[in-house]
Amino acid sequence: MSTKKVKEAEAVSEEVTQQSKLAEAKRALSGVKMALKKKLGDDIFTEKVIGILPSISTGSALIDKEIGNNGLVLGRVHEIFGNTGSAKTTLATLTMINALKQYPDKFVLYMDFEQAFNLEYSRRLGLDPDDERFIFMQPSSIEDGFEIVDRMVSTGILSLVVMDSVPAMISRREMEADYDKETMAEKPRVLSRSIPKLLEPLKEANTALVFINQIRDKLSY
């Protein structure tokens, strides 16, 4: 047998071996899937999503292009961050305006932890503060804020939630105790507990959650 035919035979043999291994792997995967579906439910394996996902425009074509999907994807958590005075709240306001336009049957929830939201400035940008679909709240603590978000997201009536801002948030424990390293660490703990709990409800309700944050030179709140 010529060298060429030997190589062809080896290639065919290798392909057959690979196909056999793949078939074996598929059988193993099928068995695992059946067991997981039986224990965790059929929804544990979701369909692959290809293409543009439902989103909300930020009002900036450049930012939307960089993000992809024409803006902030519904059902996910996003963060707008930057230095002081870098138009973070302005960008969030433009996003709220577009959410009201793109999803007229849904509400937008804005949580003003800083207690500094300028209603007149937002009006000049094009947001109607008197629109009944625009919900404006000023929670006193992080825990109150997340409880509000959890309850309202579960209704399925929101397209967008904006929490402004992370540095201005304060936990109940911080409100009641003296400022020290232990109480300062309470905010990150509350955030790390609360955000994961919202991931599935946000996905089911098709609601985008936006946190506004600030770049700091020191790792403190």
What are these regions (language model features)?
Residues 17-132, 148-154:
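The Walker A/P-loop phosphate-binding site
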Residues 56-60, 89, 142, 184, ...:
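A conditional alpha-helix N-cap/helix-loop micro-motif detector
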Residues 105-107, 132, 157-160, 204-211:
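Loop/turn-to-beta-strand initiation segments
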Residues 115-116, 140-145, 217:
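Short acidic loop-to-helix transition motifs that present clustered carboxylates
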Residues 130-143:
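A glycine-rich helix N-cap at a beta->alpha junction
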Residues 145-161, 198-199:
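Short amphipathic alpha-helices and their capping/turn segments at secondary-structure boundaries
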Residues 160-204, 211-221:
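Conserved P-loop NTPase nucleotide-binding/switch module
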